[in-house]
A protein has these predicted regions:
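C-terminal outer-membrane/trafficking sorting elements
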Residues: 20, 24, 389, 641-651, ...
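Short beta-strands within extracellular/lumenal beta-sheet-rich domains
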Residues: 507-527, 531-533, 594-597
């Protein structure tokens, strides 16, 4: 199974983009107009070319084309299932059911044609398209026409989710995902005129619950003709109301003579009342041979009536498109294509299985950790053929071998562990996958000391902080050793800057990518009023703070990673403290290092508590650095100080309206606390007395902070002065 095969053209920003939205409680929407406008704004030099292509397609003489030739247009297809081992990883049976529906719809074999309004029955067309799953992939290898890819991009479907496209002149690409970033969408496609300039994004991207009629699509409340509708767009069909406005706006035309003008429909009105429409009697309702009736049952409507027909005029338009060189459509059905993709009559895929597995939990403790859940559950996700037997091997595991679908394993030695699966159809057809450093087993007795900084200067610290790059991409935690950090030379780093060249950086972007790093165990007994604190330096490539949408989530576990409880989520100005830059951010002499101090929860004050730092990628991520991680009574930076110095920390930080200044001085003395806003206006000042080498907290009055924002807190004695940033959320 592939993880992050990076191919994509940035030109796929959606010219000719068409979106089909869900019918349940949500108005149907199409993204054609908005995305076309956005594309033209970014690429105005292409506007005339696109218009010329559209006009050329519309003016083709269909009578000169072999629309009535013997046999169908056989089109090879591939389904790219983008998933994270959830329900979106739909079965081969569900995909084959979707292909069945496509072929019935495009060949007028669907059983519900008898429900079509009598007026329109003479117009219903057999388009003559036949879709077949490829049996040979672009490298000449055996395939069942299903390409499975594990990626975080499954959850936020857009052009950057169209991973590993196969050559569009040989295969029609369909991407299946868990959901779209924009709520309510079922699918979208590119029309040929737009796809001409976006070969890597040409095809359909669709929500898994709108694929076929079984599996996750069974009783889903969505139409099983979603793919039929979207492929219509790919073959140059517009919605019946046109491509320049949403439905229910005004009467429009799709440039097909035998589909009546309509304003479009978002739900199924009574078919018997199709003449009772807004378009009745208006000047808009003049085109179309069928007068004032509206064709609610057309595949290119949103009515879900059910939709069950293309017209002869729509067929002509699609035949024009598939015989055109625009977007290489005319190459999809050639004898060469059929041979190279393995869709000739009688060709059936019988491939070696592709072994794949997953463990939802990848971090646990030693098997002798008393009273703790230490089990790792593996699950077989092999594909490409029927799996009749499995052979698992677990290094240092108990059991060490297994033949079940979901083996449960624990480990009695610590460190990274490998796992191997051999998935077999028979003795000669099998696939094997080994994943090294797949799970990490921690020894809860190997504890980090409380009230001491982990500075990462000792290389031994690195091995005890396991890093999980779940999707094996460039965006990951790593260890940094190039200096300019509070502890001296080394720190933790999250590599968030996307340094990949075009076109690789136009797909599989870091937005919503999840990466974890776990701490060793801490004995936090007696620290119910303590803190988790660390030094933070970070930047963003965003132009303004409202665009910052990455986050750092700090959680704890008292059961060896079986469950995690969130302590704090940092985002926006609470996370980014070194402004914006379009180049990679690294610490320098003038870098701002903020102290993040997070109050412990009472439930975390446990003799065996772990902490997890989870980075969730944003659209404008840059690099992030962490140093001096500590779990203790006092936050980082208020440990024992030298003569003349002042140790200061703000807790919590960020805060709502209640924050305290924790101060440590080397002698009994008076110190001044001054709070200013960002323009330097003093909004609070006081003098407090400290006790030598003892951390003391001084509460700031809540009425000091009347508005959310950033404030500067300065603590000074006769010798030294320290200023820190306080964020009020």
């Amino acid at each position: 199974m592939k993880i992050l095969n990076l191919k994509q053209s940035i030109l796929a920003l959606a010219l000719g983009f068409s979106a089909f939205a869900s019918q349940a409680q949500t108005a149907h929407r199409c993204g054609t107009d908005a995305f076309s406008k956005e594309f033209i704004e970014k690429h105005p030099e292409l506007k005339l070319n696109i218009e010329n292509l559209e006009n050329s397609l519309n003016s083709m003489d269909v009578n000169s084309l072999p629309k009535n030739r013997a046999g169908n247009y056989i089109i090879p297809i591939v389904f790219h299932v983008i998933h994270n081992y959830g329900p979106e990883n739909i079965s081969e049976a569900q995909i084959k059911d979707a292909v069945r529906i496509l072929n019935e719809d495009y060949q007028k074999r669907n059983a519900d044609t008898n429900l079509i309004h009598p007026t329109f029955k003479p117009l219903i067309a057999n388009v003559g398209f036949e879709f077949r799953l490829a049996t040979i992939d672009p490298q000449g290898n055996c395939t069942n026409g299903i390409d499975r890819i594990a990626s975080h991009r499954t959850y936020y479907g857009d052009e950057t989710s169209k991973l590993n496209p196969w050559s569009r002149n040989r295969y029609f690409n369909i991407w299946v995902i868990a959901g779209f970033e924009e709520a309510g969408l079922l699918a979208y496609a590119l029309k040929p005129s737009g796809a001409q300039f976006s070969p890597e994004g040409d095809g359909v991207i669709v929500w898994h619950r709108a694929v076929g009629s079984i599996g996750t699509a069974a009783n889903a409340g969505y139409s099983d003709i979603t793919l039929t509708h979207e492929i219509g767009h790919s073959m140059n069909l517009d919605h019946l109301w046109g491509s320049t406005n949403d439905p229910k706006v005004k009467c429009g035309d799709d440039n097909v003579t035998d589909t009546p003008n309509t304003e479009g429909h978002e739900f199924c009105d009574s078919i018997s009342l199709m003449t009772d429409t807004v378009c009745k009697g208006t000047s808009d309702n003049t085109a179309g041979s069928q007068g004032k009736l509206e064709m609610l049952q057309n595949y290119m409507e949103y009515s879900f009536c059910p939709n069950n027909a293309f017209t002869n005029g729509q067929k002509d338009r699609m035949i024009n498109a598939i015989n055109s060189s625009t977007a290489q459509r005319s190459e999809l059905f050639t004898p060469t294509t059929h041979t190279l993709t393995g869709v000739l009559d009688g060709q059936v895929a019988d491939c070696n299985p592709e072994a794949d597995f997953n463990a939802a939990r990848r971090f646990a403790c030693l098997g002798n950790a008393s009273g703790l859940n230490v089990n790792i559950t593996y699950e077989d996700f092999s594909y490409k053929n029927t799996i009749n037997s499995r052979d698992w091997t677990f290094v240092d595991g108990t059991p060490a071998i297994s033949t079940t679908t979901k083996p449960v394993v624990y480990y009695t030695t610590k460190g990274w562990k490998a796992a191997t699966l051999k998935a077999s159809t028979n003795a000669t057809k099998f696939g094997t996958l080994t994943q090294s450093d797949y799970v990490y087993i921690s020894d809860p007795s190997d504890k980090n000391p409380s009230n001491e900084n982990t500075s990462f200067e000792d290389p031994n610290d690195y091995a005890r902080w396991p890093i999980f790059n779940y999707f094996n991409n460039p965006f990951t935690w790593k260890y940094y050793d190039a200096g300019n950090v509070p502890s001296g030379w080394r720190a933790l780093m999250f590599n968030g800057f996307d340094s990949r060249p075009f076109p690789q950086n136009a797909t599989n972007v870091p937005f919503k990518d999840i990466d974890d790093i776990m701490t060793p165990s801490y004995n936090a007994t007696g620290l119910a009023s303590g803190f988790v604190s660390f030094k933070l330096a970070s930047s963003s490539t965003a132009g303004n703070i409202s665009q910052i949408n990455d986050s750092l989530i700090i959680s704890y576990s008292i059961n060896c990673g079986s469950t995690w409880v969130e302590l704090k989520s940092l985002t926006g100005s609470a996370l980014i403290n070194n402004g914006s830059q379009t180049t990679p951010f690294y610490p320098a002499a003038n870098t701002t290092w903020s102290t993040v101090s997070i109050p412990m929860k009472a439930a975390a004050a446990n003799a065996n508590v772990y902490f997890r730092l989870r980075h969730v990628g944003g659209k404008y991520s840059n690099n992030l650095f962490i140093d001096n991680f500590m779990v203790g009574n006092a936050p980082t930076a208020v440990e024992k100080v030298q003569d003349g110095q002042i140790g200061v920390s703000l807790v919590p930080n960020p805060a709502t309206n209640n924050a305290a200044v924790v101060i440590n001085t080397p002698s009994n003395e008076n110190v001044n606390i001054v709070v200013t806003d960002l323009v330097g206006k003093v909004i609070y000042t006081t003098t407090v007395s400290t006790i030598a080498n003892q951390s003391s907290a001084y509460q700031l009055p809540s009425n000091v902070f009347n508005t959310k924002g950033i404030y500067m807190v300065t603590v000074a004695n006769k010798i030294a002065k320290t200023t820190q940033k306080l964020i009020i959320q």
